[in-house]
Amino acid sequence: MSTGPDVKATVGDISSDGNLNVAQEECSRKGFCSVRHGLALILQLCNFSIYTQQMNLSIAIPAMVNNTAPPSQPNASTERPSTDSQGYWNETLKEFKAMAPAYDWSPEIQGIILSSLNYGSFLAPIPSGYVAGIFGAKYVVGAGLFISSFLTLFIPLAANAGVALLIVLRIVQGIAQVMVLTGQYSIWVKWAPPLERSQLTTIAGSGSMLGSFIVLLAGGLLCQTIGWPYVFYIFGGIGCACCPLWFPLIYDDPVNHPFISAGEKRYIVCSLAQQDCSPGWSLPIRAMIKSLPLWAILVSYFCEYWLFYTIMAYTPTYISSVLQANLRDSGILSALPFVVGCICIILGGLLADFLLSRKILRLITIRKLFTAIGVLFPSVILVSLPWVRSSHSMTMTFLVLSSAISSFCESGALVNFLDIAPRYTGFLKGLLQVFAHIAGAISPTAAGFFISQDSEFGWRNVFLLSAAVNISGLVFYLIFGRADVQDWAKEQTFTHL
């Protein structure tokens, strides 16, 4: 086991004889066989589980709210002619399985329920990120994954008990999910070499899109065949099954990992030798408040997640209402933008690291360029959606393109906090999550209000507002965004309240 002096000696040796480049080449050949890439894949699985639990209510709520079928419809099959056909009994059994409680929830109530996941998340990210940064993310993330998965199993019972209990359960579940989404970035402070930071974080982050894809693809089918409660039972169970995988395989520091090779450990440690990654107990709050580069990231987070949460919550509803798709087809069509986005997130991370490692573009140029691409093009596409609603193929093409291009932000402003203040990654990620969840609490509620006022022009107003918010955040980030470590984030500088 390496000690502090040993690590420093190794750094000195490699710095003097140039072996860092050799170690880098050896580790790069391993690709996804390296421990750090294996860690990214495990985090991808965790994000997959969390986002299936976030999205399952969005895909199930059209089945939970049945405003079109008359009350007597479940008994309509009794009017059929009597037959001994096996197909008839199979169909009857299928309809019986699909029968589940339907609730009389207005669009406003649905918007509140969909937003409730974020209501309890305003204060949780900051302490979660701070604790993960100081004590390590292993147990913070693992506990959050288990709590969120366990509570998912009880959503059908909460819905039967009443809207209030369902909202409370989703609030608690949102707090647990914040522990996962916030704490995981503290791991990359000690595991991600600067030249691989974008690809490792995007591989892990792509689990969010992959989870959304799977739950949208399978959710509608599950609702139609065995009933909407099983959407929560199945994906909650998957999350619980992931927990035993997390605890024995995850370590906060590569120095302590029992399976990592000496070459990979040396490469990671030496790559981060010039970067102050030691967690800071004392927070330079006053300097953070005055930091325009930090505010640029905060504003960008709020604006980009405004659009993200709107799309995530209302894509199934838009497809089912505007395209008149049934529940199964709505789930399949809603899944397409997310699977393409999952692929593009990883490709964007690889491209960003390629441009940086080959010194084609500076880091700040990469961050701003990828953010601009990920904001401008999707905004234009979404604003154009109401004018192509008569064409189903064009509508789906626009939705897929919007999701694919917006994924470039994951290698832009959304990862920029790792560049400017690695010492305070956990705390800053928690602070950023607060802004993201504020957007997540407001945007679906606002969308539900617009849609309830006018179903046709309501969607147009939703897309116009989302585009305006997104572009305003981009302008602020382009003006004030930076990628160098800030003075207040260096060990020598401490400013206290």
From Swiss-Prot:
Catalytically driven reaction(s): 3 Na(+)(out) + phosphate(out) = 3 Na(+)(in) + phosphate(in); urate(out) + n chloride(in) = urate(in) + n chloride(out); L-thyroxine(out) = L-thyroxine(in); 3,3',5-triiodo-L-thyronine(out) = 3,3',5-triiodo-L-thyronine(in)
Any one annotated GO CC term: brush border membrane
Impact upon substituting N66A: Loss of glycosylation and significant reduction in the transport of thyroid hormones T3 and T4
UniProt keyword Ion transport, yes or no: yes
Subcellular location(s) per record: Apical cell membrane
Glycosylation sites: N47, N56, N66, N75, N90
TM region(s), chain numbering: 149-169, 171-191, 203-223, 230-250, 292-312, 332-352, 368-388, 398-418, 431-451, 461-481
UniProt GO molecular function: sodium:phosphate symporter activity; thyroid hormone transmembrane transporter activity; transmembrane transporter activity; urate transmembrane transporter activity
Effect of N75A: Loss of glycosylation and significant reduction in the transport of thyroid hormones T3 and T4
Keyword Membrane in record: yes
Gene Ontology biological process terms from the UniProt entry: phosphate-containing compound metabolic process; sodium ion transport; sodium-dependent phosphate transport
Keywords: Cell membrane, Glycoprotein, Ion transport, Membrane, Sodium, Sodium transport, Symport, Transmembrane, Transmembrane helix, Transport
Assigned protein family: Belongs to the major facilitator superfamily. Sodium/anion cotransporter family.
Protein name (database record): Probable small intestine urate exporter
The organism of origin for this protein: Homo sapiens
